[in-house]
C-alpha cells in the first residue's frame, strides 16, 4: 500500500509525481544504494516539475545554482557560448543523468541546458541535498560516484576529440549511445537519435556534411541502417572496432 502522504503529494502535483521507489531508472540516479528510510528523506525534498517542452531551457549560463536536475525521461543538451557567439555543445543527457554538477564550484551555472524533446525532470534543491548528504553517508557516496562518472565522461570526450579521426569519432559516439540506452533498459541495437546531425557534428567537432557522409558510409558497409533519425546497428563488432572497443558490449 502507498503511504497516505505519497498519495496526497501525487494529487497535489497534478499526477506527475513518480517517486524514487517507483522510478525505473533509479539505479542510475541518486537513489541507488539508499535504504527505504533514506529514500523517504530524499523523496521529501525532490520537486517534480511538469514536462519541459522541446527547446525550453532548464537553466542558463550565469544563473545561480539553486537545484540539480535528475532527468526522468527525454534528452537534455548542455552547451556554452564561445567568445565568437557560437554554440558549443558539451553533452547530451539521458534519463537517469543529473544535470548541473558543473555549477557547484562557483554556485553558478557555466553552461546552458535545453530540452531536445519533451522531457520530465526531478528538481533537487542543492542546499537541501548538500545538508542531507552530510547526514547520510550512502547519499554522499552516491553523489560522489555520479560526479566521478561525469568527470570520466569528460576525460573520454577529450580523448575522443584528440586522438580519433572523424570516422572513429562518430562510431564511438553511436557505440557509446547504444551502451547508454542499454543501461536504461532500451534496445541497444535500434534507437532514435533525439539530437540533429548538426548537434552531433557540433559535439564531435565535425560538419553536418561529414556526419551525413559518414552515416552513408556506415550504411554501405552494412555497419548501420539509417532511416531519418532511426538507427539500427547491423554489425556491432565492426562498430565496436571502429570505435576503439575490440570487445563489443552487445
Swiss-Prot record:
Residues 164-237 form the HTH crp-type domain. Residues 85-87 are annotated as: Activating region 3C. Residues 181-191 are annotated as: Activating region 1C. Residues 47-50 are annotated as: Activating region 2A. [4Fe-4S] cluster binds at residues 20, 23, 29, 122. It is found in: Cytoplasm. Residues 81 are annotated as: Activating region 3B. Residues 197-216 bind DNA. Its cofactor is [4Fe-4S] cluster. GO terms for cellular component: cytosol. SUPFAM superfamilies: cAMP-binding domain-like (SSF51206), Winged helix' DNA-binding domain (SSF46785). Binds 1 [4Fe-4S] cluster per subunit. InterPro entries: cNMP-bd_dom, cNMP-bd_dom_sf, Env_Response_Regulators, HTH_CRP, RmlC-like_jellyroll, Tscrpt_reg_HTH_Crp-type_CS, WH-like_DNA-bd_sf, WH_DNA-bd_sf. Residues 20-29 are annotated as: Essential for the oxygen-regulated activity. Residues 71-75 are annotated as: Activating region 1A. Residues 116-121 are annotated as: Activating region 1B. PROSITE patterns: CNMP_BINDING_3, HTH_CRP_1, HTH_CRP_2. Global transcription factor that controls the expression of over 100 target genes in response to anoxia. It facilitates the adaptation to anaerobic growth conditions by regulating the expression of gene products that are involved in anaerobic energy metabolism. When the terminal electron acceptor, O(2), is no longer available, it represses the synthesis of enzymes involved in aerobic respiration and increases the synthesis of enzymes required for anaerobic respiration. This is Fumarate and nitrate reduction regulatory protein. It comes from Yersinia pestis.
